[in-house]
């Protein structure tokens, strides 16, 4: 299965009648493995800052989490495993696996819990597969 298939069928899938606004799988070094059409252009320094927060939880809190031109307020996640952010009526969930970052961006009416479930379910699966 291609990485794009994981994005299209597992991240952008419908859940309770809702779906993510955008999603991507990004390598730890910043390379985009696959993304939805609507995913923002992420800069290398933004990926580096996200990876730093996984290594040093809390490092993003003072500045916020940036994805492309979007800025998210960092909210409670799981140190070293999941980063969550909020922006207006939407937000982002980022799950770290052995080799990649699974990123899901949502807006209302999708809920944070639905986004978390979609992103973390795929992230857990890929982690268990060694990715």
Curated annotation (Swiss-Prot):
GO terms for molecular function: actin monomer binding. SMART domains: PROF. The keyword Cytoplasm applies. It is found in: Cytoplasm, Cytoskeleton. Gene3D superfamilies: Dynein light chain 2a, cytoplasmic. The keyword Disulfide bond does not apply. Disulfide bonds: none annotated. Keywords: Actin-binding, Cytoplasm, Cytoskeleton. InterPro entries: PFN, PFN_euk, PFN_sf, Profilin_CS. One of its GO terms (cellular component) is cytoskeleton. Belongs to the profilin family. Binds to actin and affects the structure of the cytoskeleton. At high concentrations, profilin prevents the polymerization of actin, whereas it enhances it at low concentrations. By binding to PIP2, it inhibits the formation of IP3 and DG. Occurs in many kinds of cells as a complex with monomeric actin in a 1:1 ratio. This is Profilin-3.
């Amino acid at each position: 299965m291609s990485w794009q298939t994981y994005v299209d069928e597992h991240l952008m899938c419908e859940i309770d009648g809702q779906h993510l606004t955008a999603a991507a799988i990004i390598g730890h070094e910043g390379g985009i493995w696959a993304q939805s059409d609507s995913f923002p252009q992420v800069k290398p320094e933004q990926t580096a800052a996200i990876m730093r927060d996984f290594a040093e939880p809390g490092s993003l809190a003072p500045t916020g989490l940036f994805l492309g031109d979007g800025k998210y307020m960092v909210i409670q996640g799981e140190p070293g495993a999941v980063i969550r952010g909020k922006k207006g009526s939407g937000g982002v969930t980022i799950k770290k696996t052995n080799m990649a970052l699974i990123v899901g961006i949502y807006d209302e009416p999708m809920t944070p819990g639905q986004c978390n479930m979609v992103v973390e379910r795929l992230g857990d699966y890929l982690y268990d597969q060694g990715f």
